[in-house]
Amino acid sequence: MTTLETLKWDGKKSGKVSLDLAVAKETSSADLIHRAVLRQLANKRQGTASTLTRSEVRGGGRKPYKQKGTGRARQGSIRTPLRPGGGIIFGPKPRSYNLDMNRKERRLALRTALMSRVSDMKAVEDFGSTLKQPKTSDIINGLARLGIQKTEKVLVILDSPSDIIKKSINNIEKVKLIAADQLNVFDILNANKLVIGQSAIDKIQEVYAS
């Protein structure tokens, strides 16, 4: 179990909250998280790259020039891979890059990744509570009050973010907003800081407890 200090939106301390998630053994955690990240990135690939082989290139029914007497290397077709515009040897064809991973392993990897970032977490009691309308500068100033630098990549985790918060964060290049029940290993590890709403911590423990 880990205890986090909670902050208010104005940056003042307001109390403490506990985060208790089962994690993988230290001997296997790195491999588990590595496989989870590989799976996530591989499954994002479209796999639609396609090239033409020698048999698929248009033309080439006749010999481009006679066999002897030209001083050039002999050629039997303009579709040969040796010529510009010819077929491609062992080029990519449409395929699936999807990798499988058991649900139990995926959830364990996510819990382990999240708990490994405890030192970079900021628990906020009332994230964006003062916003009455979408305003990017209010979010930037609020993150600064929490001790987060403009150059840092930030993952904001909220239970059910409002449209005002979504629109306010949308234009900030290094800040990403995600719902507490839609976490993924890559985003957790890719961020420099994690800002978590207090209600989101309860949601995380409810959804990912086992």
Swiss-Prot record:
The entry lists its GO molecular-function terms as: rRNA binding; structural constituent of ribosome
The UniProt entry's coiled-coil ranges are: none
GO biological process entries: translation
Note down the stretches annotated as region Disordered.
46-85
Asked if Ribonucleoprotein is a keyword of the record, the answer is: yes
Record field: compositional bias (Basic residues): 60-71
What Pfam family does this protein match (any one)? Ribosomal_L4
For this record, the Gene Ontology CC terms, alphabetical, are: ribonucleoprotein complex; ribosome
Q: What's in the keyword line of the UniProt record?
A: Ribonucleoprotein, Ribosomal protein, RNA-binding, rRNA-binding
For this protein, the record's InterPro entries field holds: Ribosomal_uL4, Ribosomal_uL4-like, Ribosomal_uL4_dom_sf
Functional summary from the UniProt entry? One of the primary rRNA binding proteins, this protein initially binds near the 5'-end of the 23S rRNA. It is important during the early stages of 50S assembly. It makes multiple contacts with different domains of the 23S rRNA in the assembled 50S subunit and ribosome.
Q: Which family does it belong to?
A: Belongs to the universal ribosomal protein uL4 family.
- Which PANTHER family does its entry note? 50S RIBOSOMAL PROTEIN L4 (PTHR10746), LARGE RIBOSOMAL SUBUNIT PROTEIN UL4C (PTHR10746:SF17)
Known partners and oligomeric status: Part of the 50S ribosomal subunit.
- According to UniProt, the name of this protein is Large ribosomal subunit protein uL4
Source organism phylogeny: Bacteria, Bacillati, Cyanobacteriota, Cyanophyceae, Synechococcales
